[in-house]
Amino acid sequence: MTQQAKVARTLTGKVVSDKMDKTITVLIERRVKHEVYGKYFTKSSKVHAHDEKNECRIGDTVTVAESRPLSKTKTWALVKIEERAAEV
């Protein structure tokens, strides 16, 4: 048997909530073309991601990767923080 390494899916989005312990909510937006009319529009989805060190803050741009289910709704894990939000 040959072992093939599975490549985890990664997405980039913005942190919209960090109120939970070791969990962040990430808003992922993508541009989609309408099949009939050809107009581009924005679709978005929110995912819960595991943040082991509680280092993310609201407004940060992050990369998350698919992982095994960690809870009922949490199946993504934080890979890295791309850009920090401005301190107010």
UniProtKB/Swiss-Prot annotation:
Which family, according to the similarity comment?
A: Belongs to the universal ribosomal protein uS17 family.
Question: Which PROSITE patterns does its entry note?
Answer: RIBOSOMAL_S17
Q: Which GO terms describe its molecular function?
A: rRNA binding; structural constituent of ribosome
Q: Which domain of life is it from?
A: Bacteria
Entry keyword set: Ribonucleoprotein, Ribosomal protein, RNA-binding, rRNA-binding
* Gene Ontology annotations for the cellular component aspect, listed alphabetically: cytosolic small ribosomal subunit
Query: Mind telling me which CDD domains this protein's record contains?
Result: Ribosomal_uS17
Protein name, UniProt field: Small ribosomal subunit protein uS17
Q: Which organism is it from?
A: Cellvibrio japonicus (strain Ueda107)
> Subunit arrangement?
Part of the 30S ribosomal subunit.
Q: What does this protein do?
A: One of the primary rRNA binding proteins, it binds specifically to the 5'-end of 16S ribosomal RNA.
User: One GO biological process from the UniProt record?
Assistant: translation
Do you know which PANTHER family this protein is assigned to?
40S RIBOSOMAL PROTEIN S11 FAMILY MEMBER, SMALL RIBOSOMAL SUBUNIT PROTEIN US17M
